Amino acid sequence: MLQLAGVSNSTCGGVRNVSVETRNVKPQGKDSKAEENGSHSFMHSMDPQLERQMETTQNLVDSYMAIVNKTVWDLMVGAKPKTTMHIMIYNVHAPPHGDQGVHLLGAAVQPALAWEREDTHGGVGRVGTAARRDAASQSCCPTCTRLGTRRHSWRSRQSRHSGATRLAWEEIDTPGGVGRAGTAARRDSRGNEKTLLEESAEQADQGVHLLGAAVQPALA
């Protein structure tokens, strides 16, 4: 028909090519609809049991990820206070039973109260020293008590010996008192010196015992 109408051969060839291309082109909307229909048909063609397994697996994965995220958050943000509370609750020993705590507190506070009482009521001088010495001698052992008694007896003997020595030297200074009286006086003075040395040694031992008795409660 084109040839009969007087159309050239080149024009006829161009029209043929356009018609062929038009036949080969398909609309895109139809292709997308076909793909969606194919996927839906595939999903519907799956086994229902397999679908349930896939849903269960997905739920488990979501729950595990939530647990992991919460754990990481606790470690990064809330680790310090939780660790502190754990140490305070689980690593503290059990409280004392009954009145044991009260007795322990009283034993710890009593020495401080005793020292304050002595300082307040003027017991720092001789009274405080005597009270401390008596308390130490009573708390240490009976030997310390005997040593305290021996110390008082030593003071009385010392006063008596000093008086006797003074009288002996007065007799020596008087006329006719240089004989046996002078020798006896010198002997008595030497004996007094030995007695003083012995008593000083006993006093040193007593000081050691008193020091041990005073330090023992602090070490305990």
Swiss-Prot record:
Q: Spell out the PROSITE patterns in the cross-references.
A: GED
Bias class Basic and acidic residues marks the residues at 28-38, 185-194
GED domain boundaries: 54-149
Disordered: annotated span: 18-46, 173-194
- Matches recorded under InterPro entries: GED_dom
Instruction: Identify this protein by name.
Output: Putative GED domain-containing protein DNM1P46
